[in-house]
Structures are given as C-alpha cells and as structure tokens.
Amino acid sequence: MSAEEAMHAREEHEARADRLSAPHRERKARGEKHPIEDFLHTYYPFSPGQLRRWHPGWQVGYEASADQAHSGVGDVDSDGCRRWYSDMQLQSGGASGAVRAADLERFARERGDAAYWIHRLLSNSSFAEKPGNFSCFGLHEWAMVYRLGPGEKRHESLPLRLSAEETNRVVEENRLVCSHIDAFRFFTPQAAPLNASRPTRESQPMRDDPACLHVGMDLYKWSMKLAPLLPSDIALDCFEHALDLRILDMEASPYDCRGYGYGIVPIETEEGKREYVRRQRLLADRSDALRTRILAAVEPLVPLFAKSSRPCAS
C-alpha cells in the first residue's frame, strides 16, 4: 500500500473504532457504569486505544512513512518504528523507501505458541467440526446467582426479574449443560455440581461449542490477540458482534435490563426458550462466519506457529 492509501485506511479504521467505543469512553468520563455494554471493555483486556490500532494484515505491506505522523502514539515509538512490524528497504526507479509489514519471525518466536493454541481452539469450535448445542438456554447467568444471599450478585445495579426463590427454582427445574470454562468458572459453589460437565482450561479446545454465546464473544479476544496478523476490520466486526451476543446474554438472564432500554427473553417459559434459540441460531451463524475469516487469515502461518508451539492456555 502507498503511504496515502495506508493513512486513509488508518483514518477510516480509527473513526469506526472511535464510534464503537464512544459510549463507554463518555460514561467513564462521567464516572458512570453500564452493566451490559461495559462488559466488552472491562472483561476483555483491551483499551479503546488498542481497538483503534489499524493493521492491514500480515499479507499486506505499506510505506513506512505513513506512520510518521503517529510517532510516539500507540504502538509507534518516538523513532517512527512500530511494534510487531519490521521494515524492508526497497528501491524502484531511482526512488527508495521502507515498506513496513508484520514481523512474522518475531511473532512466531514470541507468540507462536499462543497463536497455535488459538488456531486449534477456533478450528475445533466451528460448525464444520461439531453441531452446536442449542439446549443451554442461557442458564449460565442463572447459575451465577443460584442461592446467593443479599448483596452477593455480580450486577448489584440490576434487579432480578423473579424472586430469589423463583430464580433458584429455574436452575433446579432445568438442566445445566454449560461447556465454556469462562462461564462455568463463575457458577456459584451450589450450582457447579448441577452442571452436566466440568469444563477446564485444558479441555477448552475440545469443549468450546459453536453455538455458545460466550464462545462467540471470545472471537473479539482472539482477533485482538492475533494482531497484527489479522486485518483490523475483523477485530471491529468481532467487537460489534460481541455486543449483540452480550445483549441476548443479558436479556435472557435473571436480571431485569429494561431500565437500560433492553428487553426480556423469559427462558423460564417455553415461549422464551424458543425465542432464545431463534436468536441464538442467527448469532451462531454470524459467529461461524467470523471464525472462518480468522482461520482463513492465519491458516498459511500455522506451520510457522507449530515450530514454536508448546502447551499454552491463552
């Protein structure tokens, strides 16, 4: 890419990223919190500044002079060099300049094991590898409040839709089949033994389910961890998708989110279960399309990652 093309692509990416993070940044400046939307900024370890970093993807090089105006900002240091990138001097028609591209050798050396683990995880959790489980009905959020006492809920700013006794009964009268470690680990001690399995970090690559809302949300995390290898528009697409997943996650939860402008999916009823599955299927298809894009982007690099691979829990 020419410097002009790269700068234009960067500006477009930054503008889109800023639009996506603006509500969170504005709330933070006011000292306010949002129990639904802030999740993507507080649970996942990526700042709005990281989200706005533009990457063309490992297969694209661009004129390094495009970064001059960003010296000392983000991942560009004061000398104009960029972290996780390397420069190659080219000469053409008497003119010379540096072309900047992702530093594959360094990435493989320092992060190849994590990338290999992520590739394995995403490959195993695709619809091409396994059918999705559409019978969990979002009960993980209910298991996280099961038999808790007053003041012990994760989201104290949100009231429960049902009484504590009724909420507990929903857990007891349904089957907990959560397969995702990062949902299961928040189950209350009383709820964990009720789950059909005991997910672990070690078993995650085999257990993650393509229909799981949290597995879909995690695509945002994996796309960010694979920077600068992926085109950064994939990360923004994953972020937007994660917000849609989060909305269903909370609308189907025991919490009453109507005070924040959201609805209710009453999974304690048969009608609510049907609505949850209908929306879950649509979101799972979108998750799988994003997963496919990530895998396609890094597939040629897997042999490079494999050389440095060792057991890794990312």
Where do the protein language model's features map onto the residues?
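Short, Lys/Arg-enriched charge-dense amphipathic segments
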Residues: 152-164, 253-264, 274-283
